[in-house]
């Protein structure tokens, strides 16, 4: 292969890959429909809130050593406010209140199990196992 072909290949790999990454949404708060449900409450409540979503730049090493850890950054909460919602028709003795985080700002950092779903594939945020009710203006 001629040297000019290597140059062109290198040029296109480095020129177009970063350009395409600008098309991805950066990590930021977005409005999303989420659902909450609880044992002892027959209905699932769906409502709009702010969650963290978007792309974080990461580097995957070509050689993975069994002696080194790989830490991938994910889009997660930086600043949150907590709000409480009341589930309808809960059985007597069941606390109908559920507290959830509202994203005020987001960052690319390690996944924190306290505030984020750190699984590879998870359910959609509006998934319900019981009958769903919507709150339109919350």
Curated annotation (Swiss-Prot):
- Keyword check for ATP-binding: no
Q: What are the annotated glycosylation sites?
A: 31
Signal peptide location in the record? Answer: 1-21
Q: Which UniProt keywords are given for this protein, alphabetically ordered?
A: Disulfide bond, Glycoprotein, Hormone, Secreted, Signal
What GO biological process term is on the record, naming one? G protein-coupled receptor signaling pathway
Q: Which CDD domains match?
A: GHB_like (cd00069)
According to the lineage, what is the superkingdom? Answer: Eukaryota
User: According to its UniProt record, where is this protein located?
Assistant: Secreted
**GO CC annotation: what is one?**
extracellular space
- Coiled-coil segments: none
Any idea what job this protein has? Involved in gametogenesis and steroidogenesis.
Provide the family line. Belongs to the glycoprotein hormones subunit beta family.
Indicate the quaternary assembly.
Answer: Heterodimer of an alpha and a beta chain.
What's this protein's name? Gonadotropin subunit beta-2
What organism does the UniProt record list as the source? Answer: Clarias gariepinus (North African catfish)
The UniProt gene name for this protein comes to: cgbb
